[in-house]
Amino acid sequence: MLSPHEPVGGPSTDAIDIDACSDVLVKNCYMAVNDDAVALKGGKGPWADTAPENGPNERIILEDCEYGFCHGCLTFGSENVHSSNIIMRNIKVSTGYNFLWLKLRPDTPQCYEHVLVENITGRAANFLNINPWAQFYDAKGRTDFPISRCDDITIRGCAFECDTYFNVKADEEHYHLSNFKLEDLDIKAVFTDCDRTAVENLEISDVRIVKKDTIDYPDSVTTMDAENSVIGK
């Protein structure tokens, strides 16, 4: 699945959108697009979790795939109310902005849980990116938003080069992060800090980090504000 990134970027086109689906296998694919490669969707808005046209993504496996350039190799959202039991394994990434990207909308109740990522090699701007995403924000007058959550996320057995290893922003007003495990990782990065306070019960074991000097992706996308302005590092 191909859509050009340069010298002239193609239209915003995800390779695969998984929208309120269950029991999906993505295997032996090559993806290089000017947007997200695999995006988990399923609705947005202040009452999206109760709208009958929306739904969860459950029991999704991505394996034995290779990525060229993309904005996110595996992206949760931003239009996503619930994704659970997601496995990504045996993946090679040649380049891109974000490897694992969890977009969290301040105008949508969201839950991302039971995620396993393992046996990954490659390079991108951000290894793990969890930040607010407010593109096309519209609370529609609702003021009593439940707290969104990301729970039970495991990343293990990866060798990765990146600009930022742990691009994770705490925002307890809108979402709560809990029960993350980072195991057996070999990371080379410019920004090597890991904010342990951003995640409740963050377990880190056998993570080896080597600091590098050069930023390779100065134009990478981290988040987007309510004015639809792209924000990098």
PLM segments and residue spans:
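Extracellular/periplasmic carbohydrate-active domains that bind, remodel
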Residues: 1-233
